[in-house]
Amino acid sequence: MTSVIYPGTFDPITNGHLDIIERSAVIFPRVLVAVANSPSKKPLFSLEERVELVRQSVAHLSNVEVFGFSDLLANVIKQHNISAIIRGVRTTTDFEYELQLAALNRLLTKGVDSLFFPPAEKWAFVSSTIVREIYLHGGDVAELVPEPVFNALKAR
């Protein structure tokens, strides 16, 4: 079975992330969403909270699995027998950075390629960073994030 992995910090998961997961789930029989610990980023939500929010957000997708990780992505890829890495790219700046990561991951995994998904046009401007900024300044992020995330933000 072809398995792909979509790694990220997902702090929080946005509708842009969800769009990429949903599109991947149509193409591939098994999609793993790997939520990175990333303590250096000073996340708004803990790893456990982020994993749970992603799980709730993808509950309608039967071929999607969600887990947290703290290891090197290349090691996670080897452990799960991954065929490809899914990455979202919004801008040329994203693409340049992701191209470097793709080359590094291909080397470290002995050949696993990265597949780049541009966002749907309506999500091209959305990022977790922007969502956090809007939220921290009292703005409404309801249209930018899945309902479980919006509810979790309201409860904070």
Swiss-Prot record:
Q: Which reaction does it catalyse?
A: (R)-4'-phosphopantetheine + ATP + H(+) = 3'-dephospho-CoA + diphosphate
Q: Where does ATP bind?
A: T9, F10, H17, G88, V89, R90, E98, W123, A124, F125, V126, S127, S128, T129
Q: Which Gene3D superfamilies match?
A: HUPs (3.40.50.620)
Which UniProt keywords are given for this protein, alphabetically ordered? Answer: ATP-binding, Coenzyme A biosynthesis, Cytoplasm, Magnesium, Nucleotide-binding, Nucleotidyltransferase, Transferase
Q: Which GO terms describe its cellular component?
A: cytoplasm
Q: Give the positions of the site Transition state stabilizer.
A: H17
Pfam families recorded for this chain? CTP_transf_like
Q: Mind telling me which residue stretches traverse the membrane in this protein?
A: none
Organism superkingdom: Bacteria
Q: In which pathway does it act?
A: Cofactor biosynthesis; coenzyme A biosynthesis; CoA from (R)-pantothenate: step 4/5
Q: Where in the cell is it found?
A: Cytoplasm
According to its UniProt record, this protein's enzyme class is transferase
Q: Which protein are we looking at? A: Phosphopantetheine adenylyltransferase
Question: Lineage, please?
Answer: Bacteria, Pseudomonadati, Pseudomonadota, Gammaproteobacteria, Pasteurellales
